[in-house]
Amino acid sequence: RNEDGNFDPGLFHETASIDQIKMVEIKVSQGAKAGHGGVLPGAKVDAEIARVRGVPEGKDCISPAFHTAFSTPTELLEFTAKIRDLSGGKPAGFKLCIGRPHEFLAICKAMITTDIYPDFIVIDGAEGGTGAGPVEFLDHMGVPLTEGLLFAHNALLGMGVRNHMRVAASAKVATAFNIASRLAI
């Protein structure tokens, strides 16, 4: 981000060009923090965090609940294409937790309309947790992983765009059975 909190293409290109970075994921939403941004207290913003995040050392680092670079499905896809280009062609995609199914369908429709496809989509389950999420939201916001993954796969398949991207899962996938059951979808 630049000092105003907006996307900085030059800084992104510089960072994404690092050899260790193999792909770029845009976090649209997360099951445990639906509709919430985050605050890293200034006391935890040391010199290294300040350098990496591009924020002043010792000041609260506020991550907004939304992206300033896009606000519609079409803009999300255009932004995905832009970061793919700025990263030198590295795979680019996004992560989201299914909340309102019609919103995911709108993204699918925008793929068809624009002919822009992410390289991957990561479906996060409502049961995914984070220490930064409100306790009331843990395990209760969005669609659980299995249902969300199945919905996304079927929506992409039904719209004829599933073959354009990989679909991955993110949530409480901790055992061999969890992995096998998601792969079976």
What are these regions (language model features)?
Residues 1-110, 117:
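Active-site-facing alpha/beta catalytic cores
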Residues 67-185:
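Glycine-rich phosphate/ribose-binding loops and adjacent secondary-structure elements
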